[in-house]
Amino acid sequence: AGSDKGYTDLMDTDSGEQFDRLEGVTNDVTWLDDDRFYYVRSYRETATPDGVKPPTSRVFLRDGGQDEMVYGSGVPTSHGLSMGESLHSEKALLVMSYGWHRSTAIAGELASPDSWEKIYGGNDFLAYPIDRVRGKYLVASFEGNGWGQVLSIDDAGSVETVLGEGKEVLQGVISTADNLVSIYMVDASSIVRRHDLEGHLIDEFDFEAPGSVSSLTTDGSDFFFKYQSFTTPHRVYRLGEDGLNLLTSEDAPGDFDINDLWSTSKDGTRVHSFLVKKKGVKPVKALLYGYGGFSIPLTPVYFPSAIPLLEDGGAFIYANLR
């Protein structure tokens, strides 16, 4: 269940003054107006107001310093809730999760918690809402082989496939009124694709060095994301009508090679790793790091503690066990 404890402070952006504090494990503040907002409270040690044993979570409305539980009554133990809103702040978008392999997409009118209901999922696969566009919900679903697909669902529950399941893992996707931008994982490295809302590919972007793309967001017209790799702390990109543009970047000094490395385990399974070394150097020593658990892959991240090893002629090997 975890033992995290904390608080959330809410600040006035003009004055910088704190005007409210949420005690406990709270997340996903979603504003209704200047004075009212929803938030998700996680219960780790005590029962919920409706008497369900922890761990679980509930959605509350905060109004004038007073809390009212507005969603989640009866959600069982070991089920968690997360919450957001559609791009134009009209719809509430929620996920009810059970473990690492099952979730349900929930949505409804932002101002009316009584309208929040399941729109997809609930079986033994992950599903989460992306947005509400052109009168339909877009949902990411990981049924089938679990690679990920994007579905369009109307208010009657009719389902159409926008992006079908391929051979790459869907890591994230967001939408504007005209386009979808998705992140896929290929050999533990990210590529970025842009499609129209009918699922036609507009363009695709990979990177000179294998890396990880995260923090995908939009202002309603352009898309923004962060890229990082073993020797690159960050690069921030904007993807708009004029293509992909680099906004800011930082790289570790020096020239390095990042290559894919494949090994065969005792039972015949092929295991992928990244081999990082200084360009032109034949390593005489190496540090191998690996992890496997909770279906979490090890994708390229900036690893400053490996830089001295690389500068000293060594190699850094990053093994993917999931």
Pin down the residues of each PLM region:
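A flexible loop/linker signature enriched in serine peptidases of the S9 family
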Residues: 1-7, 22-24, 40-59, 70-77, ...
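Short coil turn/linker residues within repeat-based beta-strand modules
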Residues: 15-17, 64-66, 112-113, 157, ...
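Generic beta-strand/beta-sheet core signal
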Residues: 11, 40, 95, 108, ...
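Serine-hydrolase catalytic core recognition
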Residues: 88, 210-322
